[in-house]
Amino acid sequence: MLIIELLKALFLGVVEGVTEWLPVSSTGHLILVQEFMKLNQSKSFVEMFNIVIQLGAIMAVIVIYFKRLNPFQPGKSAREIRLTWQLWLKVVIACIPSILIALPFDNWFEAHFNFMIPIAIALIFYGFVFIWVEKRNAHLKPQVTELASMSYKTAFLIGCFQVLSIVPGTSRSGATILGAIIIGTSRSVAADFTFFLAIPTMFGYSGLKAVKYFLDGNVLSLDQSLILLVASLIAFVVSLYVIRFLTDYVKRHDFTIFGKYRIVLGSLLILYWLVVHLF
C-alpha cells in the first residue's frame, strides 16, 4: 500500500537528515535500515533513492548559509564579497580529487563494498580513527580557526580525504571533518567547510545517479515520485535542526562520542550478520 511506503519514506528521510551531517555515514545507515524495513520498490529505484534524497539535506545548507554563501548578497562589503568568492574557489578546488579519483571508481566500490560487513568494518575503523585523532589533538592548538585563513592547499587536501568516503560506511562528512582536523583546522572550520563542500559534491553525485537511472530506461511512477518527494522534504526539515545542532555542539565538544557510536554500531552489525548466517 502507498501509505505504508510513504511512512517508510518518512522514516528514511529522518535517517538521512540526521546521519548526513553527523560523521556516522548516511548512506550506510540507509542501507542498514532497509535491511529491516525495505521499500517495496525495484532495486534500481532504491539505489537511486538512497542518493537523490540527499538533495533535501543539501537544500538545508543552502537555506541556512544563503547569505554567507551568496557573493551578491545586498549589504556585503567589497572584502566580504572577495572572501565569499575565495570560499567558493576553495570548495571547487576541494572537489577536484573526487572528480579525478572517486567518480571513475564509484560503481566498482558500490558493487564490491555496499554490503553489511564492509559497512560495519568501515564504521568501526573510522570510529577508532576519530577517537585517536581527538586524543592526539587534545592539547594541540588549531592552526586554522577561520575559513578566510584556510589556504587553497588545505582545501585540496581536505578534498583528498573526501575521496575516502567512496567506501560505504565511511561517511563523507566524517572523512572531511577528520581530514580537516588532522591537517590543523578547528572543529568549527572543519564542520563548516564540510557543509559547504557537500553542496557541489552531493548535487553532482545525486544528479549523476538520477541521470543514470533514467538513461537505463527507468521511469518514475506517481507513487515513486511521492515516495522520493516525502523523503527529501523530511530530510530537508530534519537537516535544518541537525546542522544547527552540530555547529553549536562542536564549539564545546569533540567528536569522540561519534567514534564510540560507530564502533558500537559496527560491532552490533557484525554480530547480527554472524547470527543470521551461522545459526
From Swiss-Prot:
Molecular function GO terms recorded: undecaprenyl-diphosphatase activity
GO CC terms: plasma membrane
Source superkingdom: Bacteria
Catalytic activity line of the entry: di-trans,octa-cis-undecaprenyl diphosphate + H2O = di-trans,octa-cis-undecaprenyl phosphate + phosphate + H(+)
Family: Belongs to the UppP family.
Pfam name, any one: BacA
Task of the protein: Catalyzes the dephosphorylation of undecaprenyl diphosphate (UPP). Confers resistance to bacitracin.
Membrane topology summary: Multi-pass membrane protein
Biological source species: Streptococcus agalactiae serotype Ia (strain ATCC 27591 / A909 / CDC SS700)
Miscellaneous comment as given in the Swiss-Prot or TrEMBL entry: Bacitracin is thought to be involved in the inhibition of peptidoglycan synthesis by sequestering undecaprenyl diphosphate, thereby reducing the pool of lipid carrier available.
GO annotation, biological process: cell wall organization; peptidoglycan biosynthetic process; regulation of cell shape; response to antibiotic
Protein keywords: Antibiotic resistance, Cell membrane, Cell shape, Cell wall biogenesis/degradation, Hydrolase, Membrane, Peptidoglycan synthesis, Transmembrane, Transmembrane helix
Regions that span the bilayer: 45-65, 85-105, 113-133, 188-208, 226-246, 255-275
EC number: 3.6.1.27
InterPro entries, per database record: UppP
Coiled-coil residue windows: none
Keyword Transcription regulation recorded: no
UniProt protein name: Undecaprenyl-diphosphatase
UniProt subcellular location: Cell membrane
